[in-house]
Curated annotation (Swiss-Prot):
InterPro entries named among the record's database cross-references: Fe/Mn_Superoxide_Dismutase (IPR050265), Mn/Fe_SOD (IPR001189), Mn/Fe_SOD_C (IPR019832), Mn/Fe_SOD_N (IPR019831), Mn/Fe_SOD_N_sf (IPR036324), SOD_C_sf (IPR036314)
Keyword vocabulary terms for this entry: Manganese, Metal-binding, Oxidoreductase
Gene Ontology molecular function: metal ion binding; superoxide dismutase activity
Family that this chain belongs to: Belongs to the iron/manganese superoxide dismutase family.
PANTHER family xref list: SUPEROXIDE DISMUTASE 2, SUPEROXIDE DISMUTASE [MN], MITOCHONDRIAL
Protein name in the entry: Superoxide dismutase [Mn]
Keyword Mitochondrion: no
Signal peptide positions (record): none
Source species, domain of life: Bacteria
Swiss-Prot/TrEMBL cofactor(s): Mn(2+)
Substrates-to-products reaction catalysed: 2 superoxide + 2 H(+) = H2O2 + O2
Enzyme Commission designation: 1.15.1.1
Function: Destroys superoxide anion radicals which are normally produced within the cells and which are toxic to biological systems.
Amino acid sequence: SHSKHHATYVKGANDAVTKLEEARAKEDHSTILLNEKNLAFNLAGHVNHTIWWKNLSPNGGDKPTGELAAAIDEAFGSFDKFRAQFHAAATTVQGSGWAALGWDTLGNKLLIFQVYDHQTNFPLGIVPLLLLDMWEHA
């Protein structure tokens, strides 16, 4: 089930934190780096799924309104153009990953991008707003 799948990332993140503490105590730098990578992967998997669950709606949702609608129109020209670009990002992910809509805190605008695995290609300074799981299990 999806909750068991999500729980795997939480356990992986917790395990990586424990192993990081042990490796730091031993000053084992190669193990530190490995577990920092494992922590990033699993923590991102947890965060992405948490956002994704909140994005899902039993009623299917509709076009956004208010500030989000205005930001989409400004960034993409219209909701339909946004949807087409988001669809293209989602359906062309190579391997495992996500399609993402995020707020660029540096440029103060919305961006669409692909996330490889859970965290690779995720621009710094981005606040994720909408994530679509494109892993094979989704």
